[in-house]
Structures are given as structure tokens and as C-alpha cells.
């Protein structure tokens, strides 16, 4: 079984809804990135980039699981982008009952690195395993 690299319309609409809400809250504009880009959006104001944004939607409530994971691949992309631009990358998560965010940097500073489990609960192929960082949701700021 192969894993689809393309988001579906529901993913696209969910990301856009959250991006619009954050743009209003943070008084900025959001620039959606193309498929296969390193991040989902760039927040900017007066044509000046402010932050990269990566979105995730969970089908659980905020308190159902005490942690979130992010792949080493995503952290490498963040590290390279931050080294060049100095911009933060906010990891934005929508749970069934909350929306929150944290800087990807927190996954490096406070996270625990592990090998991912084999599971059907991710979009990856069942047997894909990689290094991940596991971060307590205590590091997320709820909106």
C-alpha cells in the first residue's frame, strides 16, 4: 500500500479555516504553500514574513493523549529554514475541542526522540518508521 502525498479537500478546507482565524487573531496574512512544500503556510505582514506554520488535525480531544509527535524530517526542515531566515515555525494543532500551537523548537528542546511505532493510524505506510520527537501538550498554547 502506498501513502497519498496529496491532501484532500477536507484537509485543505480545515487548514484554510484555521489559517483565516489565525490571520485575524494575529493581524497578519497567510500565504498557503504549494503541495510538497516544507510547511503549510507562511504568516506575513506588510510583505515581510513572520513565521512558518505547519498544521495538524487530530480526531481526539485535547486531553485524550498527553503528547504530540513530529517527524525528524519536519524538524530538519524547520532547523534549515530557521538558520537561514531566523523565523519561528509554529506547529498548529486542531483537536476536536481545542486549537493550540507551539514552536517546533520546543520539540527539540523539551521533546523526547524515539523511533516511531508501526501503525495504521497514520497516513504513512504501515511499516514506515522514522525518528520522531514526542512533546508534552503542556508546551502548547491554547487559542
PLM feature spans:
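Short connector loops at helix/strand junctions that flank enzyme active sites
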Residues: 36-38, 48-52, 73, 84-86
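Conserved catalytic cores of phosphodiester-cleaving nucleases, focusing on short active-site segments
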Residues: 41-61
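Short, conserved, surface-exposed binding loops centered on an aromatic residue
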Residues: 32-33, 42-44, 83
Amino acid at each position: 500500500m502506498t501513502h497519498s502525498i496529496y491532501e484532500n479537500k477536507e484537509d485543505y478546507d480545515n487548514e484554510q479555516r484555521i489559517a483565516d482565524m489565525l490571520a485575524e487573531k494575529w493581524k497578519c496574512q497567510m500565504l498557503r504553500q504549494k503541495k510538497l512544500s516544507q510547511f503549510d503556510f507562511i504568516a506575513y505582514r506588510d510583505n515581510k514574513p513572520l513565521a512558518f506554520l505547519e498544521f495538524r488535525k487530530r480526531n481526539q480531544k485535547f486531553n485524550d493523549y498527553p503528547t504530540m509527535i513530529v517527524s525528524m524530517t519536519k524538524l530538519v526542515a524547520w532547523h534549515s529554514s530557521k538558520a537561514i531566515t531566523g523565523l519561528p515555525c509554529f506547529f498548529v494543532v486542531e483537536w476536536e475541542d481545542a486549537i493550540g500551537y507551539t514552536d517546533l523548537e520546543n520539540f527539540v528542546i523539551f521533546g523526547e526522540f524515539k523511533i516511531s511505532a508501526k501503525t495504521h493510524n497514520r497516513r504513512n505506510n504501515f511499516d514506515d518508521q522514522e525518528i520522531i520527537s514526542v512533546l508534552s501538550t503542556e508546551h502548547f498554547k491554547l487559542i
